[in-house]
Amino acid sequence: MKVLWALLVVTILAGCRAEVQPELEVQAPAGWQSGQPWELALGRFWDYLRWVQTLSDQVQEELLNSQVTQELTVLMEDTMKEVKAYKSELEQELGPMAEDTKARLSKELQAAQARLGADMEEVRNRLAQYRGEMQAMLGQSAEELRARLASHLRKLRKRLLRDAEDLQKRLAVYRAGAQEGAERGVSAIRERLGSLVEQSRLRAALTSQPLHERAQAWGERLRGRLEEVGGQARDRLDEVREQMQEVRAKMEEQAEAFQARLKGWFEPLVEDMRRQWSDLVEKVQVAVRASTAAPSENH
């Protein structure tokens, strides 16, 4: 009997010791500090919640004026927005994956995403409830309310961490499926291109002789066409040369006619001037003879 009482006392003391030992801090994964944008956003939410859990004087003050809940709302919305953006990015890379596999992965991922959102929503609601309780103080001390809130926040942080890691794993599976599908798509494209190249080579080998013959025929037609055009050009050049000769002959004829007309105009005038000049010279000569004859008679 004494042995049973001793065991009971030891058990009770061990339980009390376990209760007073501080609970280990829940640590966030290292990837939340340098991972995808949604992980970075979740890390900011986690760090802010860890600061709130200290329940310092500043936290108490901001809890009472709803600043904490407002900040958590912004961080929560940023996190869920980044999760949706990353999920959409992965969905665009799931083209070659089977539709049933894609639907199953998408459904599981959507459920994990909803659980994470519900966890963050519960954290915000619990803090809002604490603010209301502190303002009402219905038969409870502030110390009791803070202790109960701290305990509840520890549980919520554990649940948040668990659901966040679950979402992280499912996103990793989703991404692996996208990469595998993309690799299969690239392999299929490579095989298709190889087949097309081989078909092109075979077609070129089969059609090389007819192509050569068609090229020769085309060259002959082109040569004949060039000769025809050259003959037409030479004929046209001869025609232009004849027209130029005709024009030159007409211009020479017109020049001769104009010269004859000018000659007809000026010859009478020149003849009249010559006659007048002869008359003038003759008159001068007569006058000179008359003047030389007069002195001789006086002697």
UniProtKB/Swiss-Prot annotation:
- Could you name the Gene Ontology cellular component terms for this entry? chylomicron; extracellular exosome; high-density lipoprotein particle; low-density lipoprotein particle; multivesicular body, internal vesicle; very-low-density lipoprotein particle
Q: Which InterPro entries match?
A: ApoA_E (IPR000074), Apolipoprotein_A1/A4/E (IPR050163)
Q: Where are the sequence repeats?
A: 74-95, 96-117, 118-139, 140-161, 162-183, 184-205, 224-245
Region of interest: Lipid-binding and lipoprotein association: 204-273
* Gene3D superfamilies for this protein: Apolipoprotein
List ligand-binding residues for heparin. 156-159, 219-226
Subcellular localization is given as: Secreted; Secreted, Extracellular space; Secreted, Extracellular space, Extracellular matrix; Extracellular vesicle
**Name of this chain's protein:** Apolipoprotein E
**Its gene?**
Apoe
Q: Which organism is it from?
A: Thryonomys swinderianus
Q: What does this protein do?
A: APOE is an apolipoprotein, a protein associating with lipid particles, that mainly functions in lipoprotein-mediated lipid transport between organs via the plasma and interstitial fluids. APOE is a core component of plasma lipoproteins and is involved in their production, conversion and clearance. Apolipoproteins are amphipathic molecules that interact both with lipids of the lipoprotein particle core and the aqueous environment of the plasma.
The PTM entry states: APOE exists as multiple glycosylated and sialylated glycoforms within cells and in plasma. The extent of glycosylation and sialylation are tissue and context specific.
